[in-house]
Amino acid sequence: MSTKSRTRSKTRLSRALGIPLTPKAAKYLEKRPYAPGEHGRSKRKQDSDYAVRLREKQRLRAQYGIREAQLKIAFQEARRTQGLTGENLVEILEQRLDALVVRSGLARTTAQARQLVVHRHIMVDGKIVDRPSFRVKAGQMIHVKPRSEGTEPFQVAAAGGHADVLPKLPSYLEVELDKLQARLVRLPKRAEVPVTCEVQLVVEYYAAR
């Protein structure tokens, strides 16, 4: 799929879910804040309970850019963990390496963060990690491989070039962009994680399966 096609696909998905998944999609949603299709402007008919829960699950999955199987595994772990399942789920997903790379400003989008990880530009505590799903633990340091620091994507990041599209830095991260590094100082809490999702609806979706 070409870059143009991927952008168009993300924009269409953003409109369908009602959330911006990329900076370009955010601008598009400002102009057309309705679902794609010829009837997008008209008032939508009342969705069924199942449709509402399904859409909320899709919104969470899309914001982390993960497959259904990955989300289901995370949900099963969240259900086994003490506490509220929905909150546990978001907190588990937020510990993904690709999520923290974009959250810290080292990448502009989740897709770019995943690419940087897969191409072995990212290290955790001095060791290269090429799995976007890698679970970062509290206290661990995420940083750019020294040989990659001078490349254009990281020079842009070091200059704060993504600040215009990323949410405010959450307090569970300590970031030094000039050094291209970020530390997960503690585990995230759901209320701090900048994702749009009614997590209880996601719990209800899986509970009914």
UniProtKB/Swiss-Prot annotation:
Gene Ontology terms, MF aspect: rRNA binding; structural constituent of ribosome
Positions of the S4 RNA-binding domain: 95-176
What does the sequence similarity comment in the record state about its family? Answer: Belongs to the universal ribosomal protein uS4 family.
Q: Which domain of life is it from?
A: Bacteria
Organism (species): Clavibacter michiganensis subsp. michiganensis (strain NCPPB 382)
Q: Which GO terms describe its cellular component?
A: small ribosomal subunit
Annotated PROSITE patterns: RIBOSOMAL_S4 (PS00632), S4 (PS50889)
Instruction: Give the record's subunit note.
Output: Part of the 30S ribosomal subunit. Contacts protein S5. The interaction surface between S4 and S5 is involved in control of translational fidelity.
UniProt keywords, alphabetically:
Ribonucleoprotein, Ribosomal protein, RNA-binding, rRNA-binding
Annotated Pfam families: Ribosomal_S4 (PF00163), S4 (PF01479)
Q: Does the keyword rRNA-binding apply?
A: yes
Q: Which GO terms describe its biological process?
A: ribosomal small subunit biogenesis; translation
Span list, region Disordered: 1-20, 28-49
Annotated Basic residues bias: 1-13
Q: What does this protein do?
A: One of the primary rRNA binding proteins, it binds directly to 16S rRNA where it nucleates assembly of the body of the 30S subunit.
The protein, known as? Small ribosomal subunit protein uS4
